[in-house]
Regions:
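Active-site beta->alpha loop and helix N-cap motifs at the rims of alpha/beta catalytic domains
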Residues: 2-14, 19-22, 27-99
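Catalytic beta/alpha-barrel core
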Residues: 4-6, 34, 57-64, 81-90, ...
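Catalytic cores of alpha/beta
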Residues: 11-19, 67-71, 96, 114-124, ...
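Glycine-enriched alpha-helix->loop->beta-strand junction motifs that scaffold or abut catalytic
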Residues: 19-24, 79-81, 99-108, 123-130, ...
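Alpha-helix-loop-beta-strand connector modules within alpha/beta enzyme cores
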Residues: 40, 44-55, 94-105, 143-176
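Active-site-proximal loop->helix
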Residues: 119-127, 141-152
Length: 193
């Protein structure tokens, strides 16, 4: 299990990372915009606080696969091996994930609202899957059940590793990164899933 801080506020990151054993930081365009600073400066400052051995997730903002691919390559060249780009599980996002994963780029599939999206993102080669728990609940789905289904799906996918190892330049070990929590109960239930 890994714990991530979901913020770009440097003071909060300093305080929390000083106390808790975190794996890294997650952000999104809205969180970054609240800081009213340059994106690259924020990400570099986050790495300076938590260390380059920790993980930072930040989202691509392109609307087409081609733009996302260019963006991901630039971001990974800028921030290094522990930088993961969050790509939404839209058709264009899946296309970008598929193309980037085969070249070894580290991708987090985000905006997941169904088990089918987890299957597509995992098959495309995303390493982290970020199902939106509360947002799923708000549209009549059960966010925790999606996490439970995700674990089952990913365990089945791991059994077909040989084909995936040939397809991708890294070990296929997808992970669940729960997102869009609104209360502690949701976090607790996701951990138990």
């Amino acid at each position: 299990m890994q714990y991530f801080i979901d913020t770009a506020n440097l003071e909060s990151i300093k305080k929390i990372s000083d106390i808790f054993p975190i794996a890294g930081v997650t952000t999104n365009p809205t969180i970054i915009a609240k800081e009213k600073r340059d994106f690259k400066d924020i990400i570099n400052d986050i790495f300076d606080i938590i260390g380059r051995d920790k993980i930072v997730h930040a989202q691509a903002v392109g609307s087409t696969a081609e733009i996302m691919i260019k963006e991901v390559k630039l971001l990974h060249d800028t921030f290094g091996e522990n930088f993961y780009t969050k790509i939404p599980v839209t058709p264009e996002g899946i296309k970008a994930i598929k193309n980037l994963a085969k070249d070894g780029y580290k991708i987090t599939a985000t905006g997941i609202l169904s088990p089918q999206q987890i299957i597509m993102a995992a098959e495309a080669g995303a390493e982290y899957m970020a199902p939106y728990i509360n947002r799923s609940d708000n549209i009549g789905e059960n966010g925790i059940e999606i996490v439970k289904d995700a674990y089952k799906i990913l365990e089945m996918a791991k059994k077909t590793d040989e084909e995936k190892l040939a397809r991708y330049k890294r070990i296929f070990e997808p992970k669940i990164l729960g997102a869009s929590f609104k209360n502690v109960r949701q976090v607790h239930e996701a951990i138990l899933a």
